Amino acid sequence: MEISWGRALWRNFLGQSPDWYKLALIIFLIVNPLIFLISPFVAGWLLVAEFIFTLAMALKCYPLLPGGLLAIEAVFIGMTSAEHVREEVAANLEVLLLLMFMVAGIYFMKQLLLFIFTRLLLSIRSKMLLSLSFCVAAAFLSAFLDALTVVAVVISVAVGFYGIYHRVASSRTEDTDLQDDSHIDKHYKVVLEQFRGFLRSLMMHAGVGTALGGVMTMVGEPQNLIIAKAAGWHFGDFFLRMSPVTVPVLICGLLTCLLVEKLRWFGYGETLPEKVREVLQQFDDQSRHQRTRQDKIRLIVQAIIGVWLVTALALHLAEVGLIGLSVIILATSLTGVTDEHAIGKAFTESLPFTALLTVFFSVVAVIIDQQLFSPIIQFVLQASEHAQLSLFYIFNGLLSSISDNVFVGTIYINEAKAAMESGAITLKQYELQAVAINTGTNLPSVATPNGQAAFLFLLTSALAPLIRLSYGRMVWMALPYTLVLTLVGLLCVEFTLAPVTEWFMQMGWIATL
């Protein structure tokens, strides 16, 4: 018997999402306009909370759908305007270009990356040393590449590893649905679960590594570039200005990596199962024997393109997204990928997230129009000069954990610059505030996927459900890093930032503009 029209509509609405989730979203959509009529400020914060809820439930339903419905309603009822949303999208065009082209560009370097990381994984047997290697590699790469690019690299490698073993475990040679475990017997499932734990820990170490390295340079994160421009700093200036905070944080972050692996805390410490190592070793040996001269040329070309990528980003020869586009063009041209459908596959991972980030910019527009952060900014600027640095760091950290890093960093640096230009603070104080804002925006935000775009990208990627990496588990595994990075960063802002910066000036390494 065919179901009723109403039941059919209910089933189609948000598809396979749980009924309670669908009901919650409908309640949000009904309540928001009513509260907006009473208090736009409260309605604005409620919208932010609801959007965070959709992100937290990313595995129930991709946040683009519920978040998009909330954003459309916000524009319709007047919480912001379509014109302001367009302005926010235009202001963040380089971030969108990064997502569209750089992440897609990495897709065409997968062979090289899988080759390198397979060798790394098979040659280092110590889990502590392997975790440290992944963390250091991610930190180094994210000092030159955007964190999203680095995470995209590690995701592609992890999916490759998982796919190799899953095909063996399911006794199928052809491409199968990696989420389908129905053909895997109990013994293989136990090993597969251990392998998932191993990959989860590596992904989290690499993700935190991107935060450790990304905060250090002006090209490491999009907001770093905005802050560097506002302060008038170049690549070397930015690195030295940040180093009184970022170098101690990097050291403590790497020590935390070793500690959680050694003590098996917070879901870390899972080793690579020997059976999986054997499968990966066989795959590596087989790949080496089957590798033709044409395949070797592809690897060499991809390595050369990798050098171009790092060089172009370090020297900032063009916008990050345009450099990514050049990688796509060079990689496809020189490795023989000419079919439109083959090229199109490169964009399947990044475009849903690009759309989600565009929806988030509409929430950012609401935050600006309803002046949700104004009370916090006014409170900070009323404090003493010394207290301002710690307060900027703390409030940046709190807001960055629930909001967009680029937005938070931009808002605070603009407010600080306006205060400097009005004479409320000195140029020297403004430059110290810029460091506090940058480190406060980057370091505590590892607490949740909402704060780090790279973490959110990981959470909503095809890999997350494969290795059972949920929002809650990600927050739990990030907790030791959150505590260490936040507290060490705060202590450095409080005690070492001003004296070390003063010493750099006396040495002539940096100068106030």
UniProtKB/Swiss-Prot annotation:
Membrane topology: Multi-pass membrane protein
A GO CC term assigned to this protein in UniProt: plasma membrane
Catalytically driven reaction(s): 2 Na(+)(in) + 3 H(+)(out) = 2 Na(+)(out) + 3 H(+)(in)
Residues making up the signal peptide according to the UniProt record: none
Keywords, in A-Z order: Antiport, Cell inner membrane, Cell membrane, Ion transport, Membrane, Sodium, Sodium transport, Transmembrane, Transmembrane helix, Transport
Major place of residence: membrane
Family statement: Belongs to the NhaB Na(+)/H(+) (TC 2.A.34) antiporter family.
NCBIfam families to which the protein is assigned, alphabetical: NhaB, PRK09547.1
Described purpose of this protein according to its UniProt entry: Na(+)/H(+) antiporter that extrudes sodium in exchange for external protons.
Name by which UniProt lists this protein: Na(+)/H(+) antiporter NhaB
